[in-house]
C-alpha cells in the first residue's frame, strides 16, 4: 500500500474531477499505459481508477472520477469529501488493459469517462507509434481533458465526436474498414458504447486477438437462474457449499478465509483465482477475453458462479 496525498483537484468537465496524487514519502512506482490503482476511501470502500497522466511521470498519479448518479458511493465520496491535502491509501498500479506489443497501428476509442486509460495510451504512443484517437461525449461540457488533448503532441490524431453536433458523428464502419492482424483496437467507456464499437469491429472481420477493452462497470446480470455449488480449496481439501444468494468470497469469509477483492463485479481482477477442476461460469469476469474465458481455468470469486457441482480452486 502507498500513503498518498491529494496535491490538486480540478474540474475537468461536467461531473468529472481529476485528482493529482503524490506519495507522502515522495516515491511512486512505475506504471504502464492502461494501468489502474485501487483507492481506499474514507468510508471503507475500495474503488479502481485508471491512471491518465503520462506513464513516464514518476512524481504523481492522475485519476479522473465521474460523479455517477448510480454510484455505489465511491465517486460521490471522492467528489464530496476529498480536497487538496487529503490523505488516501492507494495500491500499486496494476494493468489489465495493456498496449499490445508489436502493433503497427492502434485505434483508440473512448466514451465519456472512458478517456482516462485511453489518454494515457495516447501519451505513450505519441512518441513513436502510428495511432488515432476517437473521443465520443454527449457535449463539449462533458468532454474531460479536452483542452489537454487539443494542446498535446498528438492533437492531429485526435477526432472528437459530440452527440449534440451530428456533423461530428463517428462513422465507425469507415474507421474500422480493412482490418489487419497488426492493427489493434482499444475501447473504454459506457457499456452500450463499447458494445457498439466491438460489434462493429467483429462485423468488419476484426480478429478477437486484436480487440482490447476495459469495463468500468459490469452490465446487469440476471441472477434468477443462479444455483448452489461447492468449492474445494486445493491446499487443505476443505469443501464449502455456496448458496445461490451468496458469492464464493462471502462464503469463505464466513469461515475465516479472506480473499482480497474490490469491485464485486468481476471487472478489476483483484480476486482472480485459478480453477484447477470444474467449469466456472466464464462470462462474469468481464475483463477476460473470449479466448481466456474458453480456457475455463480462472474466475472471479466475488461474483462468478459454476457450471459444475464442484470447483477446485488454487487456494
From Swiss-Prot:
Organism superkingdom: Bacteria
Annotated FMN binding sites: 1-94
Pathway this chain belongs to: Xenobiotic degradation; vanillyl-alcohol degradation
Domain FAD-binding FR-type: 1-100
Cofactor(s) needed for function: FMN
Uppermost EC category: oxidoreductase
Domain (2Fe-2S ferredoxin-type): residue spans on this chain: 227-315
EC number: 1.14.13.-
GO molecular function: 2 iron, 2 sulfur cluster binding; metal ion binding; oxidoreductase activity
Positions of NAD(+) binding: 104-217
Binding residues annotated for [2Fe-2S] cluster, in chain numbering: 263, 268, 271, 303
GO terms for biological process, alphabetical: lignin catabolic process
Family, similarity comment: Belongs to the PDR/VanB family.
Protein name in the entry: Vanillate O-demethylase oxidoreductase
Protein's organism: Pseudomonas putida (Arthrobacter siderocapsulatus)
Lineage: Bacteria, Pseudomonadati, Pseudomonadota, Gammaproteobacteria, Pseudomonadales
Amino acid at each position: 500500500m502507498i500513503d498518498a496525498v491529494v496535491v490538486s483537484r480540478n474540474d475537468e468537465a461536467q461531473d468529472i474531477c481529476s485528482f493529482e496524487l503524490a506519495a507522502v514519502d515522495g516515491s511512486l512506482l512505475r506504471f504502464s499505459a492502461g494501468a489502474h490503482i485501487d483507492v481506499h476511501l474514507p468510508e471503507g470502500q475500495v474503488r479502481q481508477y485508471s491512471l491518465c497522466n503520462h506513464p513516464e511521470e514518476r512524481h504523481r498519479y492522475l485519476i479522473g472520477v465521474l460523479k455517477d448518479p448510480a454510484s455505489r458511493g465511491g465517486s460521490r465520496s471522492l467528489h464530496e469529501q476529498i480536497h487538496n491535502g487529503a490523505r488516501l491509501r492507494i495500491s500499486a498500479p496494476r494493468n489489465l488493459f495493456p498496449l499490445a506489443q508489436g502493433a503497427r497501428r492502434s485505434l483508440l476509442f473512448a466514451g465519456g469517462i472512458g478517456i482516462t486509460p485511453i489518454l494515457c495510451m495516447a501519451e505513450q504512443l505519441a512518441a513513436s507509434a502510428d495511432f488515432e484517437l476517437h473521443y465520443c461525449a454527449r457535449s463539449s461540457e462533458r468532454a474531460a481533458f479536452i483542452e489537454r488533448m487539443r494542446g498535446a503532441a498528438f492533437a492531429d490524431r485526435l477526432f472528437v465526436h459530440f452527440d449534440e453536433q451530428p456533423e461530428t458523428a463517428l462513422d465507425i464502419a469507415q474507421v474500422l474498414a480493412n482490418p489487419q492482424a497488426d492493427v489493434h483496437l482499444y475501447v473504454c467507456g459506457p457499456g452500450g458504447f463499447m458494445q457498439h464499437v466491438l460489434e462493429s469491429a467483429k462485423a468488419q472481420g476484426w480478429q478477437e486477438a486484436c480487440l482490447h477493452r476495459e469495463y468500468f462497470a459490469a452490465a446487469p446480470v440476471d441472477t434468477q437462474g443462479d444455483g448452489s455449488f461447492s468449492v474445494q480449496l486445493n491446499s487443505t481439501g476443505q469443501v464449502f457449499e455456496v448458496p445461490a444468494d451468496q458469492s464464493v468470497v462471502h462464503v469463505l469469509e464466513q469461515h475465516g478465509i479472506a480473499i482480497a477483492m474490490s469491485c464485486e463485479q468481476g471487472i478489476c481482477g483483484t480476486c482472480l483465482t485459478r480453477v484447477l477442476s470444474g467449469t466456472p461460469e466464464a462470462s462474469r469476469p468481464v475483463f477476460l477475453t473470449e479466448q481466456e474465458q474458453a480456457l475455463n481455468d480462472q474466475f472471479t470469486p466475488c461474483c462468478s458462479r459454476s457450471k459444475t457441482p464442484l470447483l477446485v480452486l488454487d487456494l
